[in-house]
Amino acid sequence: MFENIKAIFFDFDDTLQSRAGAFRIYCSDFLSRYFPAIQGEAKEARMDEMEAHVDGGYKSREEYWPEMIALWGWQDAPDLDTLVADFNTNFGKNVVMLEGSIETLKALKARGYLLGMVTNGNSLLQNTKLDTAGIRDLFDMAVVSDDIGIWKPDKGIFEYAMKTLGVTPEESLFVGDHPINDIQGALGAGMHAVWVDYGSFAGQATPGVPVVKNVSEILKILKG
């Protein structure tokens, strides 16, 4: 099925790194800076509230922060621009790579595959994540949707990635966790796809698309 693959493209959040794990660290840091008097169980409870309202990272910051301000009755809250900037600047400094992800990238690189990264999100935030993770050098290209104005699942961002590496859809494999943004988007661009199912989108497998529980399983389904 994947005999002619030359390039493998990856999503980042919840494919290679645990967004929830990284966000938990950010929540703790945020509360320490803005609410230093809140400690112990009270701090944990507020971190839980931050996690519960972020919608897995798919809610816009412009919608998220007003919700938190209202929930907490935060009378002296900074303005929205300040809070959005805090998120985009500081969240990316916390990265929790998923088990086996870095080792898998290195193994694929050693096999001679070209590696690409295609991730949705704010440019500063996502680029900071890649730098914090220390994996940028493993990739032959990386594109953040915000940098080119095209967001997954629009096929344009996948076509941009393939053009950058000089490969055709038949020579390209996309690996991601989101059944629409990653899998349907890649298929719409003519690419092959593998769905990494960590359980967030249970029951949303795409017929004919291989499913793995961890990116390391890709090594078993690729020749070589």
Give the label of every model feature segment.
Residues F2-E99:
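N-terminal helical cap/lid subdomain that shapes the substrate entry/recognition surface
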Residues M1-I8, G21, P36, I102, ...:
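Asp-based, Mg2+/Mn2+-dependent phosphohydrolase catalytic module
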Residues Y113-L115:
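Short beta-strand/loop segments at the ligand-binding rim of alpha/beta enzyme cores
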Residues G56, V95, M117, L173-F174:
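Residue-level marker of alpha-helix boundaries and capping positions
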